[in-house]
Amino acid sequence: MASDFWLIAGLGNPGKKYEDTRHNMGFMTADVLAERWTVNFADHKGLAMLGKSVMNLDGRTVKFFLAKPLTYMNDSGNAVASISAYYQIEPDHIVVIHDDMDLEFGRIKVKAGGSAGGHNGIKSIDRSLGTPKYARVRMGVGHSKRGANAHDNTVNWVLGGFGPDQRKQLPEFLADGADAAEDIIFHGLAKTQEKFNGR
């Protein structure tokens, strides 16, 4: 029987050296949610830091798990699939938060299904769940210079930090990402897309 819990997974890479990098937008947004809803993380089978709590919004209450995979980005699917199988959470009750180079810094787009857009964490989750039909909060980080060394530029870009201006805007951006995850759960995908995708 499917659980009535939701699973929110913020993607990133574990370890100090990745802490404030663009690729860790998901982790950082998960931390905002953890603070808002008093989530205490504990280890889940060595695959993720996982906590659970309850959200109370608009007179409704929703139980949820919050996960930060420890598998490194490219194997995020192992963690997400393990949690969803263990707690019987269906893909339509999963929200994944991740960085997205196709969007400028500060922009958020919400979607379910469709292409992974070259994001290895999303490709891994699609593979492990056997479907792309879960909700995604795409957090814009802009993109590196194209050109001869495009792959290396991309790797250096996503594993790089934020400039001073972006760092100033980051708290508000992360709060918006957390709002988007909550809105998907409480108001559904279409309404959340209307609110965020046109900004």
UniProtKB/Swiss-Prot annotation:
It catalyses: an N-acyl-L-alpha-aminoacyl-tRNA + H2O = an N-acyl-L-amino acid + a tRNA + H(+). Its EC number is 3.1.1.29. The record marks D99 as: Stabilizes the basic form of H active site to accept a proton. Coiled coil: none annotated. GO terms for cellular component: cytoplasm. InterPro entries: Pept_tRNA_hydro, Pept_tRNA_hydro_CS, Pept_tRNA_hydro_sf. It is found in: Cytoplasm. One of its GO terms (molecular function) is peptidyl-tRNA hydrolase activity. The record marks N13 as: Discriminates between blocked and unblocked aminoacyl-tRNA. The active site is at H23. SUPFAM superfamilies: Peptidyl-tRNA hydrolase-like. TRNA binds at Y18, Y72, N74, N120. GO terms for biological process: protein quality control for misfolded or incompletely synthesized proteins; rescue of stalled ribosome. Monomer. Belongs to the PTH family. Hydrolyzes ribosome-free peptidyl-tRNAs (with 1 or more amino acids incorporated), which drop off the ribosome during protein synthesis, or as a result of ribosome stalling. Catalyzes the release of premature peptidyl moieties from peptidyl-tRNA molecules trapped in stalled 50S ribosomal subunits, and thus maintains levels of free tRNAs and 50S ribosomes. PANTHER family: PEPTIDYL-TRNA HYDROLASE (PTHR17224:SF1). This is Peptidyl-tRNA hydrolase. It comes from Bifidobacterium longum (strain NCC 2705). The lineage of its organism: Bacteria, Bacillati, Actinomycetota, Actinomycetes, Bifidobacteriales.
